[in-house]
Amino acid sequence: YLSFRDEATFSFLATDDRSFGEDQVVTIGNTRLLRFAILYGANASGKSNLLQALEFLRKFWLDDLITPNRATGATPFLLDQETMNEPSRFELTFFVGEVCYRYTLSLDNKRVYEETLHYYPGEEDNEVMLLHRIFQDNRSVITFGDMVQVSPAALEELTIKCLPSLSFFTARSMVNMSLPLIDDVYNWIQDQVGLTIPPEVDQVYFNANLIAAKDPEVRDFLSAFMRRADFNITGIHVETETMEMTDEIRNYVRQSANFPDRAKRAVMRQQTLDRHNVYFEHTVKNKYGTEIYELPHELQSNGTNRLYGVEAAIYDTEKRNGFLAIDEIESSLHPELVRLILDQ
């Protein structure tokens, strides 16, 4: 996949090294997991592509664009005559609550060849199959493990919805049914796997506005954090403006990099759109005494907007006990500000 020709593993399993303190580790049963990890490496060494692989999985699981000939979006390793024609393969082991799962996916740009989901009932138990989906006779063939009871009618409907280029989870979202354990994973994907934060400031700022607009607690936290960062910012407030959806707005949304594809399609179906404008409060002392001014984000530095966006995403992720990937966390930020983020 992308620049990865051979298997590469990125693990959050903690070693026995206790020199950094147990506050950086969370324990589930007998498994010790790191709360966060930092990738170092030379330019063009694949750091961003690793994060892009995680973002690809998130989008693939949640994509709701249902067309017969849609592409999966997978790009193989193209610097080898063999691998450019081979499927890309992903494997993800993760916890949802106290339950450990293992998910695998094999696909190229046209179709999914195999998709599986297993879980471990206990730490000493062997893994148990929940789902096995393969491409056979030009269609998806889905098999469930003994733990999952599905009626023949529901299985047939699910099979029809599960087009060759779609994730099983996309098809599952279109069928009214209950899938114990599998639905726990689906809900985890929706609620706790966050959008990867890119280096570009505009998209980070846009995502932060969505978070700050709906949660006063986030705004209070960000105000306090920006004061600690010594930006001469003493407060943050959000004004929400409801606008009618015009062709001009739809064209802007369609072309904007700030909207994920799934969000774009949801917005296109709406008759109105909420626009969140953030204002930063600056308190200054001059010959007139103490005065307060409010400035929009356009008049803030890239570093201010980047710090605001990154910290909003981290705070929201911690509240949801979720997963968040940040590409080039240091982009537009002084090293001391990066330290401030990591020290929280």
Model-identified regions with their sequence ranges:
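Switch/communication elements of ASCE P-loop NTPase nucleotide-binding domains
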Residues: Y1-G29, R35-N49, A53-L62, E281, ...
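Short acidic/polar mixed-charge low-complexity motifs
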Residues: D6, G97-Y101, R111, D125-E127, ...
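Conserved P-loop NTP-binding catalytic core
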Residues: V25-I38, A42, L51-V112
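Short beta-strand segments that buttress and anchor functional surface loops
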Residues: F90-F95, L117, F280-H282
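Electropositive, glycine-dotted interaction segments
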Residues: R102-R254
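A short mid-domain helix/strand-loop element embedded in enzyme catalytic domains
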Residues: V185-V201, T272-T290
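Generic recognition of flexible, low-complexity loop/linker segments
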Residues: F221-M226, R265-M268, A312-I314
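Mixed-charge, low-complexity intrinsically disordered segments
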Residues: T246-R275
